[in-house]
Amino acid sequence: MRLPVLIIAAILGLGLFCGSALAKQLWLPTIDNPYCAITTYLLPDLPEQALSTMDNDHPIIVVSAMTMAQSSAYGRFLMAHECSHHTLGHVAVYKRELGHLGPQPFFYIAPQLRHMELDADCNAVRMLKIKNEPETIEVARQMMLQFGGKPTGAYYPTGIERAANIARCAAKY
């Protein structure tokens, strides 16, 4: 029963990363992103909570529909966080640094990933403060605490580190 859903999600996902802009407009739902003017897609069955990338040299953000449904406040933090990766130049650095590398590209940028995540979190907090969304900041801090001492992703800071960083940035701005 679940196989047709997975096949459809795979086709949609492939269309997002390989298809034309028109195909995306017709098939993939978008969501209003109040934190930046970057097209933000809502994708079911996305293995990540959210991600930032480029599509035909255009910045895009993809957010998990499941994550948004579970917590719209945390989803808003993720949108601000992913906007930050674009505005801080992280996506461009990633593309520039990995464009010429072989089969293990993460090896080359792993040292930068921790710093990029903390910077994106802090910039997201700044944007959320500007939009007067303190509850969104607190929800994000609480979500990070759920990771505890475990990394929140490959080569990422731990949940405790990210929660402390979010609190520091909230006090700063």
Regions found by a protein language model. Give the residues of each.
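Bacterial N-terminal signal peptides
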Residues: 7-17
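Catalytic zinc-binding patch centered on the HExxH motif and its immediate surroundings
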Residues: 29-60
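Short pre-active-site segment immediately N-terminal to the catalytic Zn-binding motif
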Residues: 63-77
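Catalytic Zn2+-binding segment of zinc metalloproteases
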Residues: 74, 83-99, 132
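Active-site His/Glu-centered metal-binding helix of metallohydrolases
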Residues: 79-88, 119, 123
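Post-HEXXH active-site segment of zinc metalloproteases
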Residues: 90-117
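An active-site-proximal "capping" alpha-helix that borders the catalytic cofactor pocket
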Residues: 113-131
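Long, well-structured alpha-helical subdomains associated
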Residues: 130-173
